[in-house]
């Protein structure tokens, strides 16, 4: 019940804040063509995609708050296709997308390295990967606290990891 109803509403409320909306607008400004979004959630990115986006395909392992998703999808300026599958095995052809997007998702994917490799596979040769994530701090004091708090965070935030080195994972995936 918590993971299905309470946590998604809490995250939708937190991530709707103006600071996050500003970050989304900046992140998504270069998106164009056919876009793959990893971790659709409740669709908070939808209003921030530019007019250069012609279609959005998204993967998310579980449906979240279908009423909010339906409302946001209905307001989109382009077709939106959502599949409830894992990001580690994307059900798309090689080089199918002009752009891929991930916002606050790589922290929860069980095998982010596999997901990033598969994202690279489905991107066209000159495709762009746009991401907005949190991860392990470079400050050793903060990093130690992230390590200490990670088990609790993982439990209360439905699999979110505070201490992943997202930047390194992205670089390693190419």
Each language-model region and where it sits:
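Conserved alpha-helix/loop element of class I SAM-dependent methyltransferases that forms part
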Residues: 14-34, 44-48
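Class I SAM-dependent methyltransferase SAM/SAH-binding core
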Residues: 36-38, 42-89
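A short acidic, Gly/Pro-enriched loop at the edge of an enzyme's catalytic core
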Residues: 88-100
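A short SAM/SAH-binding and catalytic strip from SAM-dependent methyltransferases
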Residues: 98-111
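A short glycine-rich, Lys/Arg-flanked "PGG" loop and its adjoining helix->strand segment in the class I
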Residues: 113-125
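Conserved beta-strand signature within the Rossmann-like core of class I S-adenosyl-L-methionine
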Residues: 126-134
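Short alpha-helix
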Residues: 158-174
């Amino acid at each position: 019940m918590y993971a299905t109803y309470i946590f998604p509403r809490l995250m939708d409320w937190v991530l709707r804040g103006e600071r996050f909306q500003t970050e989304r607008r900046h992140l998504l400004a270069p998106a164009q063509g056919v876009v793959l979004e990893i971790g659709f959630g409740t669709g908070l990115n939808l209003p921030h995609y530019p007019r250069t986006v012609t279609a959005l395909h998204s993967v998310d392992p579980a449906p979240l708050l279908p009423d909010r998703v339906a409302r946001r999808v209905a307001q989109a300026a382009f077709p939106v296709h959502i599949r409830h599958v894992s990001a580690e095995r994307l059900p798309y052809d090689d080089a199918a997308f002009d752009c891929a997007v991930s916002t606050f998702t790589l922290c929860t994917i069980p095998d982010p390295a596999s997901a990033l490799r598969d994202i690279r596979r489905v991107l066209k040769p000159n495709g762009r990967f746009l991401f907005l994530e949190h991860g392990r701090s470079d400050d050793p004091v903060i990093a130690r606290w992230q390590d200490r708090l990670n088990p609790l965070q993982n439990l209360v935030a439905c699999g979110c990891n505070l201490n992943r080195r997202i930047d390194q994972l992205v670089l390693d995936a190419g």
